[in-house]
Amino acid sequence: MADTTPEPSGHLIVHSDTHSDTVLASLEDQRKKGFLCDITLIVENVHFRAHKALLAASSEYFSMMFAEEGEIGQSIYMLEGMVADTFGILLEFIYTGYLHASEKMTEQILATAQFLKVYDLVKAYTDFQNSHNSPKPPALNCSGTPVVVISNKKNDPLKRKRGRPRKTNSLQEGKSELAAEGEVQLRVNNSVQNRQNFVFKEDSVRLNEQTPKEKELEPAGEPGSVEEMPAEKDENSDPKARDGPGSQSRYSKRRTRRSVKLKDYKLSGDEDDQSTAKRATCGRQKRSSAPEARCKDCDRVFKYSHFLAIHQRRHTGERPFKCSECGKGFAQKHSLQVHTRMHTGERPYTCTVCSKALTTKHSLLEHMSLHSGQKSFTCDQCGKYFSQKRQLKSHYRVHTGHSLPECNHCHRKFMDVSQLKKHLRTHTGEKPFTCEICGKSFTAKSSLQTHIRIHRGEKPYSCSICGKCFSDSSAKRRHCVLHTGKKPFSCPECSLQFARLDNLKAHLKIHSKEKHASDSSSVSGSSADEVRNVLQLQPYQLSASGEQEIQLLVTDSVHNINFMPTPSQGVSIVAAESSQNMATDPAANITLLTQQPEQLQGLILSAQQEQTEHIQSLGMIGSQMDTSQTEPVHVITLSKETLEHLHAHQEQTSSSVPAADTGARASSPPSTRPGAELTQAPLTVPLDPSPGATVGGVALWAVLL
């Protein structure tokens, strides 16, 4: 109904009484379909999708929250201290103007409304209580439920507005399952006019939309099972082709995707006729089910034929959606849109806890579970919980008997195919991710992102104990282990303990290579070659011309030594000088022999931050490396565990060398031929003119040959 008011100037003012209801009904329909929703509210692991604009207009609580948030696109909030069912009813009131709840829940609903500052509901319920105390009894529906309609009009029969999501029906056959509870319904007209007039409609009844939960679906893949497409909803597609907000996971019931407004569907012949009769209660009836959408190739059943058409592309291999940048094809439009974000760098989904931006809503939901510690994915076979869907898929192979993807080169197994593809690059040498600044390439995109932080000087990860900053989170974790002093990783061969797992893995390779060397008696290797394999150095060779070399002797008082040669330098030989007890003998050391074709420049010796005062640059040959240099710099790290192992290795090899030869070796320089073995120790002199010069207990020695 529209009111027309003439104006003196000849203009007309037309007011529609149904426009606000139509807009609300349209927004409610969009919310059910997940269309254009830009916020997800999580209450007790239940996800409610909604529109920020309507929430802010209806609640001062949300209005202030969004004002502080700013424009960050898609967002997810976890609301603590609320009940999911109560919040679902309150959210339905915001979208429809109706409160549909049992009388015993009204107190909790009002408390939630007052907390969220939804004052329209508080005022409407107060007015309803005042009106309910009048002697005129309210009309009852088929289950004895009083129905109260609040309107701003006097004595006008309530007319159905176009687009309203629910309608009134006459009494039908059958008894409602809701008869056990008294139900109260309120309708509020959200105009600015007075809302104190009430009209009781005697013939109107309503059906609670929260129908009883039906039988859970069978796991997908079996004949007769029901599967909904797992793809995320596309906001640009036709809303009519969308499904409801809830869907079954292929392997489990995902609790976080559950919704109070979930409507189950039923296949013909799936349940007995009694369940059908129960749903034929007062209120509107469900429309007749559409013909069964079954795949002829794998016998899977889908809710809509639209999903079946998308699924059949898996069998036909059809990929109609092509990327304009790289030409990659996709079976779904949504998959193409997500892929395009890789080229554009768009990350529309932002975590409200740590502000991390992600490309898809699915990845944001999994990321949020890391903050909450909740494991939202459940195995329907054994009931085990997982925080990520890929973990559930990997676990499900235990029940299906399918093996994990395995690398053909090293037989290592992975959780999914994507991880295997990344791993295969380590064997093939493929490095598709290239730095635009220096041209260095990487096998993984995450490695490139970490590398770019080095150019920018970004170190977002800091140690809470010493304050040292890192550009990589994994480097920070490895550093924090040093503060604990714990060495939880022990070698099963020699019982040597390590603080980090990667050091243990590198150490285990030593034993495997030693066993291989002992088994192959025909193949002999020098001590220097074996030590080089221990440290996994690149096979640098000495120059034939025999240019300058430098030798560094470092005692075991230093935990980690980083030797950083310039691109013109190369590490040729790494060996351990003999010592009876490295733990007690300060003369125990590691010898690094390096060569360079030109003059020694930019040679830097560095250590951990707390040991910086014990390490000095070699001032006689240049103390700083050119910071503008963009060529790659090779870094060799010698940990304390490596020093201990090298000493143990040297004890084994030195036992076969006569003691008389030791003095003879100190009098002659080492061979500088390419690939020469370290059979003689070079004569060393201290850098400082004073004999036996040390820096903070760390002996630095150099020799020029």
From Swiss-Prot:
Would you tell me the Gene Ontology cellular component terms? nucleoplasm
InterPro entries named in the record = BTB/POZ_dom (IPR000210), SKP1/BTB/POZ_sf (IPR011333), Znf_C2H2_sf (IPR036236), Znf_C2H2_type (IPR013087)
Q: According to the UniProt entry, which residue ranges have a biased composition of type Basic and acidic residues?
A: 203-218, 230-243
Keyword Zinc listed: yes
List all Basic residues biased stretches: 251-260
Keywords for this protein = DNA-binding, Metal-binding, Nucleus, Repeat, Transcription, Transcription regulation, Zinc, Zinc-finger
Question: Which residues lie within the region annotated Disordered?
Answer: 151-178, 203-286, 646-691
Q: Which residues fall under the DNA-binding region feature?
A: 159-171
Zinc fingers (C2H2-type), renumbered ranges? 293-315, 321-343, 349-371, 377-399, 405-427, 433-455, 461-483, 489-511
Q: Which GO terms describe its molecular function?
A: DNA-binding transcription factor activity; DNA-binding transcription repressor activity, RNA polymerase II-specific; RNA polymerase II cis-regulatory region sequence-specific DNA binding; zinc ion binding
Major place of residence: nucleus
Which compartments does it reside in?
A: Nucleus
Domain BTB positions: 37-103
> Which Pfam families does the UniProt record give?
BTB, zf-C2H2
GO BP terms: namely: hematopoietic progenitor cell differentiation; negative regulation of transcription by RNA polymerase II; regulation of cytokine production; regulation of DNA-templated transcription; regulation of immune system process
Q: Which PROSITE patterns match?
A: BTB, ZINC_FINGER_C2H2_1, ZINC_FINGER_C2H2_2
Q: Does the keyword Repeat apply?
A: yes
Q: What does this protein do?
A: May be involved in BMP2-induced transcription.
Q: Which family does it belong to?
A: Belongs to the krueppel C2H2-type zinc-finger protein family.
Q: How does it assemble?
A: Interacts with MN1.
| The protein's name in its UniProt record | Zinc finger and BTB domain-containing protein 24
The upper taxonomy is: Eukaryota, Metazoa, Chordata, Craniata, Vertebrata
